[in-house]
Amino acid sequence: KGIDIVFIGEGYDARDIADGKFERDCENGYNYFFAVEPYKTYKEYFNVYSVLSQSDESGIETVNTIIANKFMKNGERDVDAALLWAKKARADIDLTKTVVILLDNCEDYYGWTYMYSDGSAMSVVSISEEAYPYDFRGQIQHEAGGHAFGKLGDEYIYQNSYIQTCPCQCCDHPADEQSGGYGLFKALDWYKNLSMYSDHNMVPWAHLMFHPKYSDRVDMYEGAYMHMRGMYRSEITSCMNNNIPYFSTISRQAIVERIKEYAGERFDFDEFVAKHYDVMRKNKI
């Protein structure tokens, strides 16, 4: 049956659709999603759909006009409407195991993902024309591949401070692994690429740190989830840090575990190592 990915569009008017722009953007998004491991290896596990969604005007915003977008309500994203629209791909689609990718017809760089505790998720991705790695490719891989399906957390750093005491508004400032929105996702066994534990025996990637094939790369690196201190990641950099086309080892494992779970198959760590060790050699980051 396969795992479903559904592309829908925002800000594509009749001319954009007739000229094939929406189709081209969907095709590029599809190619980018499967251009990075482990999605490249497990591509046959997925079904990919695109559903036309015509807006009254082209684009997301301009200087002199208020754009009439399809999936907006009172100036906010109407996620419920977008998810309902995605079901047009197939009547029996299970949104709790589906990645919905809302393509914003805009060249500016931005993206975010709505993640819900039942597993449903929608990534909003602009058709960014910024330089690598902040291009459309980077957006698709980070938002849709990392957040929406992989259930991974952000590894980039905005604040040079401890996450528990920082006065910023960019996160929920968890006090520990069980608190805040961070703790909620951790309780769902998500965010496996992050940990607040400084003890290497307690982190989700503990089994990789002394593995002969990963010990030269996987370690404890402080700084993630927007903060320099108080949160740890497993590798120096990855797609969840700065959008490069490389997911860290624990991130790849989490993604493959989810693929296998949704497919009704058993995850085998030895099989994972055999298939994905070459990624380490190919990506000398």
Give the label of every model feature segment.
Residues 4-9, 47-50, 99-103, 123-126, ...:
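Structural recognition of the beta-strand scaffold that forms the well-ordered cores
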Residues 12, 16-25, 117-144:
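Short pre-active-site segment immediately N-terminal to the catalytic Zn-binding motif
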Residues 24-32, 147, 253, 257:
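Solvent-exposed, polar/charged alpha-helical surfaces in well-ordered, non-transmembrane soluble domains
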Residues 1, 40-43, 91-97, 213-215, ...:
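Extracellular/periplasmic catalytic domains that process cell-envelope and extracellular macromolecules
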Residues 15-19, 58-60, 109-125, 149, ...:
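Extracytoplasmic/secreted cell-surface and envelope-processing proteins
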Residues 31-39, 145, 150-154:
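Sec-exported extracytoplasmic/periplasmic mature domains
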Residues 1-95, 105-108, 277:
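Propeptide-to-catalytic entry region of secreted or membrane-anchored zinc metalloproteases
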